[in-house]
Curated annotation (Swiss-Prot):
Cofactor note: Binds 1 FMN per subunit.
EC number: 1.6.5.-, 1.7.1.17
Residues reported in the UniProt entry to bind FMN: S10, S16, Q17, S18, M96, Y97, N98, F99, S140, R141, G142, G143
Family in the record: Belongs to the azoreductase type 1 family.
Natural source organism: Escherichia coli O139:H28 (strain E24377A / ETEC)
Name this polypeptide is given: FMN-dependent NADH:quinone oxidoreductase
């Protein structure tokens, strides 16, 4: 039995293409892997606090006493990291906003990227500590950006996930959704076909 963690990060709730596709992924996965456990965390509905000068002090090893706000941030960081490490498959619904990921997803990453916990520095360079996972990124875009200089989502997510130890990453693209109903429907259809292929593998 595998455990699947789905991270939603769109601000558009039910209107979101990435949310709809991640819901489709969950439906297909449950159909093919009925014994697996699926956890869904909606980072827009339940936002992660923005990392600031006070909160960053809670995430670094220190003997200094923590403020109540820092204690809350550290407890949330511990919870998010434990959840991440407890799952085998990580599904990230990542819409493109202004060429990059959403603020909601970036805030999540800022709380799970912790030296000595999810990665460490060695004499040979950084080493990821979140290993043995597979990641599937479902990314929706209004325009066409794949393999072009305006796609900052794909390299960023590949780099971040690899940095913490997740190197088996597959991408599902839904592009051109702002080009009209016909293009949006094709984007959804192509993305669902890619999801079907991943789920069946």
């Amino acid at each position: 039995m595998s455990k699947v963690l789905v991270l939603k990060s769109s601000i558009l709730a039910g209107y979101s293409q990435s949310n709809q596709l991640s819901d489709y992924f969950v439906e297909q996965w449950r159909e093919k892997h009925s014994a697996d456990e699926i956890t869904v965390r909606d980072l827009a509905a339940n936002p992660i606090p923005v990392l600031d000068g006070e909160l960053v002090g809670a995430l670094r090893p220190s003997d200094a006493p923590l403020t109540p706000r820092q204690q809350e941030a550290l407890a949330l960081s511990d919870e998010l990291i434990a959840e991440l490490k407890a799952h085998d498959v990580i599904v990230i619904a990542a819409p493109m906003y202004n060429f990059n990921i959403s603020t909601q997803l970036k805030n999540y990453f800022d709380l799970v990227a912790r030296a000595g916990v999810t990665f460490r520095y060695t004499e040979n360079g950084p080493e990821g500590l979140v290993t043995g996972k597979k990641a599937i990124v479902i990314t929706s875009r209004g325009g066409i950006h794949k393999d072009g200089p305006t796609d900052l989502v794909t390299p960023y997510l590949s780099t971040f996930l690899g940095f913490i130890g997740i190197t088996d990453v597959k991408f599902v693209f839904a592009e051109g959704i702002a080009y009209g109903p016909e293009m949006a429907a094709k984007a959804q259809s192509d993305a669902k076909a890619a999801i079907d292929s991943i789920v069946a593998a």
